[in-house]
Structures are given as structure tokens and as C-alpha cells.
């Protein structure tokens, strides 16, 4: 079985392409990094990408925090993250929150527990991470939402844009199950809802 070094080497051409592409389109040579050589800049970006891959199996508390920036073109390769609150317009209106003990529910006000980090896992699939609690949003095979200190397959959610410009989040590991909040702000079981129901509609807010 190939080790981390083999996987890292296999990804190097893609990383080089992403770094050099902006200058290639202008027909010019890539400039050197302000604080060193171009090689040093490439190495820095490469190490950052590999570190995120290798740390995926560690508890999040052991992983370094990284600044989140707004998503744009090329985010899927470089792992660009978005800081958002996910607002569900049910009842009095609730933001999805991840509590320090790993419980997941809704809260009406903007709180530190409702600040989430959305990171692309692959095109159309994201992880949802509680910035304050340091837990990932995850969904079990029975549709129960829970906070996971590790990133696992149950932490992958397919981000679906709906006709009303809200998003639905379908568990990638358990298709047909969606993140949902009740009119009282409680987490609903993902296997008892559908994207046609308002309880599954979330609006990402800054």
C-alpha cells in the first residue's frame, strides 16, 4: 500500500499547476516570492496541502488553526475555507450550532458556537466544522447529527443549491439523509426529512 510520501508526490504536478497558472495566462514568467525564491513559495504551499491531508486522521484539537478566506476559483485544490453561519428559517429562525460537548442544534442569536468553517472536500462536497467547539458536524447511519473530533466519512456533506437560493446538506456517506432543524431549534433525524421540506433549507451567512 502506498504511503503518504507516494500520495504527496502524485499530487505535486497539480499543486505546481495551480500555483503557476495565473502567470501562464499572461505569457510571463512567474515572479519569485517576496520573502524568498519561487521554490520556497511552492514548498510552503505544498507543505500546507500535505499537512492538511496527513492530519485528517488526527483529533482536530491537535491540528493547527488556519485563517479562513472567502471561497473562489481554485478553492477545491487549495482547500480554501469559508466562515459562515447556516441559517434555517423555521420557527423563530435558527443558526446551526455545534456545542462544546459535541451536541448539535439551533440557536436564534449569533453566537460563537454557531460560527462554522465550511471546507471543500471535493467538488460539491464540504465539511462543516465548529470553530469554537472544534468538532466536525457528522451524521450517523440512523440519521442522528453529532459532533466528531475526527474528520471521517460521516463528516462529508453534499452542498446542494435549491431553487429558493438556500442550500441543503446531504450526508455523502449516507445518501438521502439531510441536516435539518425543527421549529424548536432541535436537530431532526436526517432519514425523516427531504430537501422539499423547509427544515432542511439553510442560508450561509457571514
Curated annotation (Swiss-Prot):
It comes from the Eukaryota. The keyword Secreted applies. It is found in: Secreted. Keywords: Developmental protein, Differentiation, Growth factor, Mitogen, Proto-oncogene, Secreted, Signal. Belongs to the heparin-binding growth factors family. Interacts with FGFR1, FGFR2, FGFR3 and FGFR4. Affinity between fibroblast growth factors (FGFs) and their receptors is increased by heparan sulfate glycosaminoglycans that function as coreceptors. This is Fibroblast growth factor 4. It comes from Bos taurus.
